[in-house]
Structures are given as C-alpha cells and as structure tokens.
Amino acid sequence: MRARLGLLMAQQQVMLRAITMKNKPEEMLAKSPKGTVPVLILPDDTVIDESLDIMIWALQQNDPDDLLHKDHPEDLASALELIHHNDKQFKPQLEIYKKAIDPNQPQTKYKYVLLLVV
C-alpha cells in the first residue's frame, strides 16, 4: 500500500501486476530473488524491492505536494523515524495483539486495550 500511495502521489505511471505468492513468476524471481512484494523494476533494470524505498524513489522523481519536505530535511528525517518505529515496534506488537484475541471475550475489552496501546 505504501509503495502504491507513493507512486500515486508522485504521479508515476507503472504497470501493476498481481501475483500469487504461492506461484511467483520466474520473471519476478529472476529480477528479485528475495521473492517479496512489492517490486519495482525500472527501465534500466534497477530493482527496488522495499515499499518505503519505492515510495521515496517515486517522490524523488516528482513530488508536487512536497511530501519529502525538500526545504526542511529535518521533517523528512522525523517522518522516516516514525515510519521505522511503526514498522519495527508497533506493527509486530499489533500482530501479537491481533493473534491473542479470544473470541469468547466481549469486543469492548479489546477496544479498551487497543486505545491504551495507541
């Protein structure tokens, strides 16, 4: 989602190709042996296979809304720090929380806990 939003905001035209993760195309694996998505393959065969890197690349090409804060690099650094915190600390904790939900408990119990976490 992050990569797609970056590409959209940067008005970059790309060809989207939906793949089945259980049946990854050989063409994709030849370009990006890591086998993860998203993958952006540039005309010069450069491969970008991290969503944040794709977003930043796209906005470096065209950033009509100044989302990279070119005149205030400290703002970009703060935003990237927040993204890193979300990816490395919050998301794993959220996954643990989601897997621990007991369907026999009332939903309000979990909503209250989530409000405390956020």
Regions found by a protein language model. Give the residues of each.
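Acidic, glycine-rich loop-and-strand cores that form catalytic or ligand-binding grooves
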Residues: V117-V118
